[in-house]
């Protein structure tokens, strides 16, 4: 979401919360979130992954019709090009246009992780902070098959404020209180509903 919708305050708050509970935080700026970054994501060994990236469970057909996709696409910061012909031709990669930009960027679909990613998630908790992160469960299922403990996200499109608002209460509840990730999700939900 840094692409067109940055939120430095969220990054600072999340970093402070995580570091205060012993986590070592690695922030990856959007321009470094590439196809290769996603390919190596399971093998990085991260306990907690906050994917604050554009995402969608829909695609546009050649005729211009918007239809449900078979999985969620996660946007990269890598401009669309002729690179990765094998992955493009097999439908593992697509193009993604974000609001406020006229440039297309690569997006990775669920099957990319199933067929082209390296390594396994070490019981990671993955939070997909973009739109529709759980609208179609296939990508989350693939993450679980690759060793993730849990995948948390939204079912629909939303504004960045609504997507960012529950993240800090979730981290606070999960890391400091401490609650299970399921309890922390409920706490975060209550915090934004009140």
Which residue stretches match the model-derived regions?
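Cysteine protease catalytic core and zymogen-processing segment of caspase-like enzymes
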Residues: 58-151
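Extended aliphatic helical segments
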Residues: 25, 33-35, 53, 60, ...
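A domain-level signal for caspase-like cysteine endopeptidase catalytic cores
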Residues: 1-95
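Extracytoplasmic/periplasmic, Sec-exported soluble proteins
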Residues: 3-10, 41, 101-111, 118, ...
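Proteins with a high burden of low-complexity, intrinsically disordered sequence enriched in S/T/G/P/A and R
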Residues: 1-5, 16, 44, 117-122, ...
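Active-site-proximal C-terminal subdomain of hydrolase catalytic domains
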Residues: 124-194
